[in-house]
Amino acid sequence: MPGHLQEGFGCVVTNRFDQLFDDESDPFEVLKAAENKKKEAGGGGVGGPGAKSAAQAAAQTNSNAAGKQLRKESQKDRKNPLPPSVGVVDKKEETQPPVALKKEGIRRVGRRPDQQLQGEGKIIDRRPERRPPRERRFEKPLEEKGEGGEFSVDRPIIDRPIRGRGGLGRGRGGRGRGMGRGDGFDSRGKREFDRHSGSDRSSFSHYSGLKHEDKRGGSGSHNWGTVKDELTESPKYIQKQISYNYSDLDQSNVTEETPEGEEHHPVADTENKENEVEEVKEEGPKEMTLDEWKAIQNKDRAKVEFNIRKPNEGADGQWKKGFVLHKSKSEEAHAEDSVMDHHFRKPANDITSQLEINFGDLGRPGRGGRGGRGGRGRGGRPNRGSRTDKSSASAPDVDDPEAFPALA
């Protein structure tokens, strides 16, 4: 019925790989114990003191092997104590010598708490039945790639293999980023597309209706290329170089191996070319000494000339009788007096000498007496009356025309 929830859920908790770690005991010791037991059984039928001593020695070796097995208990057995019923059976079996584990169905007891003995060496597994693995939808085997490393394009998105954790899809490093989801989405809702060589138009042409372009094996523009390209490109260049070198050697060998008696009638153009080549070959690198090289450099270098006047060059004879003139002290003093008079000359109506300007009167107002306002404040209010008297005495009256005689 729709909307009806499933009542029960199951989950497998046991470790299916637990049997892989069942290798604490040494198999060689187990085999030796089995051989000793066989010898003891064979020597028991023959009477005599020698047989008894051999049986005692075999029993001693068996006890030593059993003690070693008890010491080699794993940490898993210590952490998971066995139930009382299994512990009793285990104690009984420890008294007996160990038997080789070659027979099918016989395993070491006490390895897992959910297994119990039944009869002789038979183990009952009381674990819950495992659920069958879920069938993956749209799962198909991977298609084998071609030689050029081409990817299959005509396959629809639904038929691609599941890209879960450890899935078969082409993810980063062979493992998909989606947490077990096979639809190409990861946990953040971001879709991750497969990487194809070429453009997206050719990859999804059967969906978008565009013209399909065949792959070119990874070659051409807008393609990544194939792995074989790097391996095949380098030998080509090597073969070309080798072929050119061999061709030059073959030509030289042919010219050397021709006998002197044979006559050659080459074309005129070829003779001219050969002569030019010989002339070029004869001209080797020029060798010269250091002095010769410096002489060539000095010839090519441009000489710099300066028009420098020599001493007493172009001297005029009329200036030979000249001498230095010094000013007298009286003239210097008179010049200074004239400068001072000119600088301090005053007009007749200048009244600046009559004005008295005292900048100290325009300063801050004086502080009041101590103890003002309850005897605590230092800065009492200033005496306004004295301030007004001083300002009225110093400041001229603007309305009085006699205060400004120059303006009258």
Swiss-Prot record:
Q: Which sequence positions carry the modification called Phosphoserine?
A: S25, S197, S199, S203, S205, S208, S221, S234, S330, S392, S394
Compositional bias (Gly residues) spans? 164-182, 363-372
Give positions of region: Disordered.
33-292, 328-408
GO biological process per UniProt? negative regulation of translation; PML body organization; regulation of mRNA stability; ribosome hibernation
Free-text tissue specificity from the UniProt record: Expressed at high level in the heart, skeletal muscle and kidney, and at low levels in placenta, liver and brain.
User: Mind telling me where the Glycyl lysine isopeptide (Lys-Gly) (interchain with G-Cter in SUMO2) cross-link is?
Assistant: K102, K211, K228, K281
Q: Which residues carry this modification: Omega-N-methylarginine?
A: R165, R188, R216, R364, R367, R370
Instruction: Kindly list the positions at which Phosphothreonine occurs in this protein.
Output: T226
Subcellular location per UniProt equals: Cytoplasm; Nucleus; Cytoplasm, Perinuclear region
Biased composition (Polar residues) is annotated at 240-253
InterPro entries registered for this protein in UniProt: HABP4/SERBP1-like, HABP4_PAIRBP1-bd, IHABP4_N
Q: Family assignment?
A: Belongs to the SERBP1-HABP4 family.
From the Swiss-Prot or TrEMBL record, give the protein name: SERPINE1 mRNA-binding protein 1
Where does this protein come from, organism-wise? Homo sapiens (Human)
Q: Which gene encodes it?
A: SERBP1
